[in-house]
Amino acid sequence: MKIGFDNEKYLKMQSEHIRERIGQFDNKLYLEFGGKLFDDYHASRVLPGFQPDSKLCMLRELSDQAEIVIVISAEDIEKNKIRGDLGITYDSDVLRLMQIYQGLGLYVGSVVITKYNAQESAELFKNRLEKLGIKVYRHYLIPGYPTNVPFIVSDDGYGKNDYIKTSRPLVVVTAPGPGSGKMAVCLSQLYHEHKHGIKAGYAKFETFPIWNIPLKHPVNLAYEAATADLNDINMIDPFHLEAYGETTINYNRDVEIFPVLNAMFQRIYGESPYKSPTDMGVNMAGNCICDDDACQEASRQEIIRRYYASRRRLLLGACSEEETYKLEMLMNQANITVHDRPVVDAALTEAERTNGPAATLELPDGSIVTGKTSDLLGACSALLLNALKELAGIEHEIKIISPQAIEPIQSLKTKYLGSRNPRLHTDEVLIALSVSAATSKDARLAMDQLPKLKGCQVHVSVMPGSVDIKQFKRLSIQATFEAKYEKNSVFFNNKGV
């Protein structure tokens, strides 16, 4: 992987910039954290060199000044809203996040339940947190929010919310997911702090879109691809252009809400500290790109992967056609097609040659390895073994797992576990390989290559099973699939998608 982002520079510059912003106010800053505080794999893919936990590392540098406030909506508690990436409810994720932050030496001050209306489930969650010794505050639904500014910024609006007692200069406001009410919590606190004679500040920390690179830069287009389901649109910040004559990039929701925020700031402070949505941000990522070409190419590949992921969801009925059409449009804007992903043509060519499912993997040196379906192995399983043999320098003809090791697993699947498919999935073939490694030097050597698969690109000519998809993720392989089922699949239709 070619590095395009200076992570060390980012950690230093970002923490310094946040300290500067704290100093612009009465040593009190409410920082709304958008996106993921850790495990930010999108950023690490489009900015090669960005570490998935960079934002968390940056916060740890400020740990003596920072406290975290976690926000959750009572409506999300009531609906048992699930985090799609983790499969857990938002209220469970609050406890998970607290444990992670505290384990890293970060201080979690409290939890805020927004849109509170004495919902039974919200009250139960509040009681549960308080029994654990966690401070809980309630923020209520405000009639006319967010447009009725005179009412919102009054004792009958923000004034009815609980005042969150904080003890440190930097208050990081985060949440399990979008729509939790982070911004409203920050603004409510500005109102209450002002009542207490403190001129606290507000800032927003989101990595994307990057404000100081071009609108149609592939990194920013990749952000639109990542949020295609939300229909976020990057745009030139008109307020910043008018105030400073400078072109900067923001996204539509921040631009649309800025006049309302500006009016709120004016009502709280008497004047607004910001002239544009860009002014509110503190993101320094754009200043830390050290190889623009590397970041552009990484982002183009991300857009293609997002396109394939959308086509898969469309086949499963999990997204709209509009989402897929938007991704096609973004590919056009980036001047790319699926053929710019090297593993795609290689997989389709192999599938045509063998008249069956095929999979291809691009190794770190750029060479392509293929896998095809056989009586013993599925295409993805064969691909993994072939890639490991190639990395280990083992001749292709050498069998690193003997058929005698595979056949008992096949028998178990078909005779006792009710499976109709005797071929080994990727998880099963890796277990067989690990067993063989106890007695085979070649199998052991192949096993040792597994970490080298991290970040490799894969394409499969059909939709693989969920087990294989999950295994690719566990190995940190970036995989795409054609949105069609294998011909003998019960789900097969001749049209595909």
Task: Please describe what each predicted stretch is.
Residues 1-174, 189-350, 356, 363-365, ...:
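Flexible phosphate-sensing "switch/lid" loops adjacent to ATP/NTP-binding sites
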Residues 372-373:
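Short clusters of small/polar residues that mark proteolytic maturation junctions
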Residues 177-178:
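The conserved Walker
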Residues 376-392:
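A short, polar/charged loop-to-alpha-helix boundary motif
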